[in-house]
Amino acid sequence: MISIANLSKRYGAVNAVQGVTFSCEPGTITGFLGANGAGKSTTLRMLTGLTRPDAGSATIGGKAFTELANPARTVGVMLDTSALHVGRTGRETMRVAAMIAGVPAGRADELLAATGLAGAARRRVGTYSLGMRQRLGLALALLGSPSALILDEPANGLDPEGIAWIRGLLRDHAARGGTVLLSSHLLAEVQATADRLVIIAGGRIVAQGTLRQLLAGTGQNLEEMFLSLTSLTSGGSR
């Protein structure tokens, strides 16, 4: 389970995240939606120990990310695939990560095949397309067979076949009792994939629940509801 309670972060005069509270239950996929600058990235960075919150807490399986003895065994994280080492091959990237996580090297090769990168495993990551880097980032997230996944824009750069593939993978993970937190700007894909939605605007949560709950009585579709909620709050977050 992923739990975020009263999480806040301020950068100078900017309240990037203000009192954010939500949870992601095992066996479900939670879609985390927000416009650029709404506070999604800052929230995910605090959840994964990359940014220290000013207030509040964020836990995965009851522990803060920084308290996990071997994070890769508990949570798979994919935030920014542009940060991958461009001079390493796909296989080198996976095997170094496997060594750090304490998992067999064979697991790295298994995931390269599962994500469709076996044929490109000996190529340097710097030659990969955006879609290939996304697949590699997902393979890294899955390396330790974690129960929870935190993924930021995992469908970026993927073609329709790739998007359908990742949707199936995430649904299978949730069906086996896993917890998925998925950040995306692709509303239609989130609608097709997620069980619950959390919408952030101006650093605050403005709506959360199932799609049916959020749309009940509004006469709107997801896009219309999202735009109406996010347009009420001006930008300024990260």
Regions found by a protein language model. Give the residues of each.
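Helix-to-loop junction immediately C-terminal to a conserved catalytic motif
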Residues: 48
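A short, surface-exposed alpha-helical micro-motif characterized by mixed small hydrophobic
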Residues: 190-192
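ABC ATPase "signature
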Residues: 208-209
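Conserved ABC ATPase "signature" region
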Residues: 95, 99, 105-120
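Conserved ABC transporter NBD signature motif
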Residues: 24, 56-71
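Catalytic Walker B motif of ABC-type/P-loop ATPase nucleotide-binding domains
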Residues: 149-153
